[in-house]
């Protein structure tokens, strides 16, 4: 479980330059917030949408506000892509994810592959498990879809996970669905057909595909249950 910082109600005015978004606060003030999501945020960046932002006055920050959540399709969606790694890390430590139980060590951001860092490296003696975490916010017809924009980086990660399996290790591509209205996860072939091809190839070559739904609220975010990955 991840405890959210105090969240401030706001209304989205616009998102622009990928990492910036303007909001109107309840007192009418207009503020600019950092958008911690490099994807297209399709369906999650509609002007006029209710949102929650956080504030941090740490010295050196260019923007004191960060966009955390948005309300779309009558539900709250977590758009901060820095949170899923922490959610999965905490869930593994708490034995919430039964498929990843029994490991003695969890290390974040470990170098591997070609100039890459694995999100989480699990170990048990000489046994290694490489876990790549992906945040999912796009939904169509009750299915969570990834990615919401073409991702060369995501394609690279799948190739590197396949290489880890070839070397005799365990590798997992882990989807965190930060919205409650999805019953399954699938590749967004219409957006990035190459990612879809590589995801199917990775699954056929031993990379495990896991997906968990996250319960998003103003106070907390936590993983609740596994979702099927439909290829």
From Swiss-Prot:
InterPro entries (alphabetical): SfsA (IPR005224), SfsA_C (IPR040452), SfsA_N (IPR041465)
GO molecular-function terms, A-Z: DNA binding
Signal peptide: none
Sequence similarity: Belongs to the SfsA family.
Protein name: Sugar fermentation stimulation protein homolog
Source organism: Geotalea daltonii (strain DSM 22248 / JCM 15807 / FRC-32) (Geobacter daltonii)
């Amino acid at each position: 479980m991840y405890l959210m910082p105090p969240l401030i109600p706001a209304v989205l005015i616009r998102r622009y330059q990928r990492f910036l978004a303007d909001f109107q606060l309840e007192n009418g003030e207009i503020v600019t917030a950092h958008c911690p999501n490099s994807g297209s945020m399709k369906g999650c960046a509609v002007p006029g949408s209710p949102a929650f932002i956080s504030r941090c006055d740490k010295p050196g920050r260019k923007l004191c506000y960060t966009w955390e959540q948005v309300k779309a399709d009558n539900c709250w969606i977590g758009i901060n892509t820095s949170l899923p790694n922490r959610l999965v890390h905490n869930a593994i430590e708490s034995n919430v994810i039964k498929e990843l139980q029994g490991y003695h060590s969890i290390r974040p951001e470990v170098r591997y592959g070609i100039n890459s860092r694995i999100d989480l490296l699990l170990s048990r003696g000489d046994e290694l498990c490489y876990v790549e975490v992906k945040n999912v916010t796009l939904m169509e017809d009750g299915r969570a879809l990834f990615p919401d924009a073409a991702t060369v980086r995501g394609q690279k990660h799948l190739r590197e996970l396949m290489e880890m399996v070839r070397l005799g290790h365990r590798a997992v591509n882990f989807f965190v669905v930060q919205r409650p209205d999805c019953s399954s996860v699938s590749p967004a072939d219409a957006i990035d057909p190459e990612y879809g091809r590589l995801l199917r190839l990775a699954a056929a070559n031993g990379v495990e595909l896991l997906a968990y739904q996250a319960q998003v609220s103003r106070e907390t975010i936590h993983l609740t249950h596994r979702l099927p990955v439909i290829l």
